[in-house]
A protein has these predicted regions:
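P-loop NTPase catalytic core
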Residues: 144-147, 151-440
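P-loop NTPase nucleotide-binding/switch module
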Residues: 74-76, 83, 90, 103-152, ...
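Mid-sequence acidic-hydrophobic segments that form the walls
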Residues: 98, 102, 121, 174, ...
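Short beta-alpha junctions and helix-cap segments that line functional grooves
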Residues: 21, 48-49, 63-64, 78-82, ...
Length: 440
């Protein structure tokens, strides 16, 4: 070890043996230093770090744990095998840390037969299938206005406290995917515990693999948790399963990347994010989608927007990468309607092809009414609009209570795709094949 600055370690003698992304083992030489390092790490496992830069000064490492007990006389060696993992379907029902160690008090998860690289390349574009059939998300507002097909990747964009985590809980409970892989990146420990025990519940956890990296973990582990989440999802997809991959949040993954690349010496650009952050985002997210076989990974990724500003650099990059965006609005949340979906600002790139022929006119009609009401909301609130001035606005005012009731949904309520469109058709006065006996 030559130098320790902040969280960055610089060592010599390995420049010809390691490359970027390799994992190294860091071994304190003295007994006292080893004991101190083990106490800081919380276990007696070897201390690991990843190579993030190489230059004439030596090999630059960022550690997977705290640096307590590490001195300049520490010995650094190449550690092989940490860039691959062997997931198994027997991981379903388990909560794991970024190194695939159990967090639920159970035994170590059994390894699968096939080995997967954590940083695998996405499938070649010419080998990918198109979107699969529509996925019933179990959330009425999303089924109606932002349809999601198997293999699609969508973002949930919102500021803090607008209901992203609650919406993820609903998706985890109510969607009809075969299996779920949930990545909690940079979350508070209390929220992780609440999601595992109250949010998912026993039924949701029984079909989920949960990967957790809390906010107090080093940036390298927060980054690794996101890659482990996608790797587990790929392994389940290769078993022919329709996997729903939920990551909360991509913004905190990007913040971890910012820490890593700034420590490695990259210059900051847009809002302090180095260029490599924007290069790495698609490398992670492109791994979701339809596979080359029967399985698929449908991805729903939350994006925390600063000050509810969708032009934030990470939010802007995510909209360009993903196949749709679900926007949650603070004003709607403050009015008490959850999920706080902003229908007019949300978009699914699988629409309108995802809709059946009888569904499309109903949804288009509803969107026209919602837009008409939004454009004249101020006049209506001031009492300046006179009924009869515009038939479309009159219809929008009359339909608003029914539309708001349809968009609202309790966390424990599960909607059914066919019934959702039938209810919307009845609310708007459309004839609908499956609307028999359905009332609002």
């Amino acid at each position: 070890m030559r130098r320790c600055r902040g969280t960055l370690l610089v060592c010599g003698g390995l420049s010809g043996l390691v490359g970027l992304g390799d994992t190294c083992r860091i071994e304190p030489r003295s007994h006292n230093q080893r004991e101190c390092a083990w106490r800081a790490a919380g276990d007696r496992e070897p201390l690991l770090g990843e190579v993030v830069a190489l230059d004439e000064a030596g090999v630059h490492l960022l550690p997977f744990s705290e640096l307590a007990g590490i001195g300049l006389d520490a010995r650094v060696t190449l550690a092989r095998g940490h860039d691959r993992i062997r997931p198994s379907t027997r991981w379903i029902g388990r909560a794991l840390d970024p190194l695939a160690r159990p967090l639920d008090g159970g035994p170590a998860p059994p390894w699968g037969a096939a080995s997967y690289p954590l940083h695998a390349r996405p499938a070649p574009a010419h080998q990918r299938r198109d979107f699969g059939p529509r996925l019933d998300l179990g959330v009425r507002a999303l089924n109606l206005f932002t349809p999601c097909c198997r293999g699609q990747r969508m973002g949930i964009f919102a500021g803090s406290g607008v209901g992203k985590s609650t919406l993820l809980t609903m998706l985890a409970r109510h969607s009809d995917a075969d299996a779920l892989v949930v990545g909690l990146i940079g979350e508070r420990g209390r929220e992780v515990n609440a999601l595992l025990h109250q949010g998912l519940g026993s039924a949701g956890l029984a079909r989920s693999v949960v990967v957790v990296a809390t906010s107090d973990m080093p940036a390298m582990l927060r980054r690794r948790a996101a890659y482990l989440t996608l790797t587990v999802a790929e392994a389940l997809r290769d078993q022919g399963l329709a996997v729903l991959c939920l990551i909360d949040s991509v913004t905190r993954f990007a913040m971890a990347l910012r820490e890593i690349y700034l420590a490695a010496g990259e210059p900051p650009t847009s809002k302090g994010y180095p260029p490599s952050v924007f290069a790495e985002l698609p490398r992670l997210l492109e791994r979701a989608g339809p596979g080359t076989g029967d399985g698929s990974i449908t991805g729903l990724f939350t994006v925390l927007v600063e000050g509810d500003d969708l032009s934030d650099p990470i939010a802007d990059a995510m909209r360009a990468i993903l196949d749709g965006h679900i926007v949650l609005d603070r004003r709607i949340a403050e009015d008490g309607r959850f999920p706080a979906l902003d229908v007019l600002r949300s978009l699914s790139r699988s629409a309108p092809a995802a809709y059946r022929p009888e569904e499309r006119p109903v949804v288009e009609h509803a969107r026209r009414l919602i837009r008409a009401h939004a454009e004249t909301a101020e006049l209506i609130q001031l009492g300046a609009y006179r009924r009869g001035s515009d038939p479309l606005i009159d219809e929008a005012i009359a339909a608003r209570p029914a539309l708001e009731a349809l968009l609202a949904q309790d966390v424990d309520e599960r909607s059914v795709l066919a019934d959702d469109f039938a209810h919307l058709a009845v609310a708007l006065g459309h004839a609908y094949p499956e609307a028999t006996g359905v009332g609002v």
